[in-house]
């Protein structure tokens, strides 16, 4: 699986998730929530004590819901519309830590390490960033 974040522009960033079969692409807003920061927190919690975390991908006013779940050493990422009548799944992939979590982690790390402070995206929460780095390092063992 590949998880990539494009260049942020005026509070919007392109999110692309691909694998050998599927492609999910959407431009996500940082209003009302910073989904990149929320994803960073979700990874930290998922690797330390949670079994499932959800992150809202805001399209103003619509949204997608990204769920990342863990069952033993199998991780699953799902993108859907949340609690809707249709329950349509727009993207889903499962795999081990290297196949699901590392692509997300590397993309988040790259996003924050390469940002320019002039761009219109909230600054990284250094404590949450450090928590994510430590959680991944501990899990990798």
Model-inferred region functions:
Residues 1-8, 42-47:
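Short linear motifs in intrinsically disordered
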Residues 46-61, 113, 117-118:
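A short, charged
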